Amino acid sequence: MATGHPSQETEADHAIGSALEIWEGYASDPEIRFQGSSGGVLSALALYCLERENMEFVLHTGADEAKPWANKTVQSRNRSELLARTGSRYAPASPCDGLGLIEKSSQPCVFIGKPCDTAAVTMLRQQRPELDHRLGLVLTFFCAGTPSTQGTLDLVKELDVPLQKVASVRYRGEGWPGRFKVRSRNGTKEKSFSYRESWGRLTGYRPWRCHLCPDGLGRVADISCGDAWERLDNGQAVGRSIVIVRTRRGQEILHKAMAAKYVELEPVGACAVLAAQPNQVERNREIWGRLLGMRLLLVPTPRFVGFSLFRAWRSLPVGRKARTVLGTVRRVVFRGLWRRRPII
């Protein structure tokens, strides 16, 4: 079960969920802004918490040094460690496996994860008082699904880099939106795809469960951030983020970080989120129909509370509603999604 808290003000407010404030901007540190995926705001906020709020570490996802095409949960304790781990990681990640480290910490910590991770953390902290006490700030980012590791491996193969010679895999960053880059161990070779090419391929490797997720904008966290894509379309050359403040704690930290010049932000409205992230909104309009298609075949479905999916579904044209339901039925049948499978 996932939960959301939609606003009742305007359709735009309803589409993005509960928000105390909405901003647009970037990290004040030019290196963090350049290295980050979309302006470096999450990294800048995490750094502020380490340097000014005396938080012990940031628990998040980084590349696995032994297998650079895979991810692992890491702790960053300073600017250099955060910088080395900036940028998106479009492969499976499970930062919740490090929550025990936060519980054992001597000071509050920052947690950064996907919307599904932060939703899990929010529910878990209600049952684990020490975890709740040590979570200084929970951050998430806009998410369109997590491709399988095979997606990355196939991209590396397309670039004709032998797996045993891969030194690093970078999905984004080093500019906006950045390129998918594979560096060889000898340090002399780097091959790459554009962001559009790489993400276009990786989307085909997302699991079905991601196609049913209504929480791409990260409703269950203190702060959620993502690309201000409309700025890129308008010729903006450096990264910019949409920043949605969800909680009083997030609001307090963000305002302090702005005052301390860690981030440069300007206020915007809910409509700016829709302009920056139209695909997130469009996807949510189809989810109720996908769930309906599964129920018609008696396939179990996840339960979502507070997202008002039927309200979003009603705004679709009749033809698109039919295509969504029928397309889901075809997927369930031809992909064997109706079969029970063991969890490995």
Predicted region positions:
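N-terminal extension/subdomain marker
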Residues: M1-A44, Y48-N54, G306-R340
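Portal/gating segments that form or line small-molecule/metal binding sites
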Residues: G36, V41-L50, N54-K104
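A short alpha->loop->secondary-structure connector
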Residues: Q126-T140
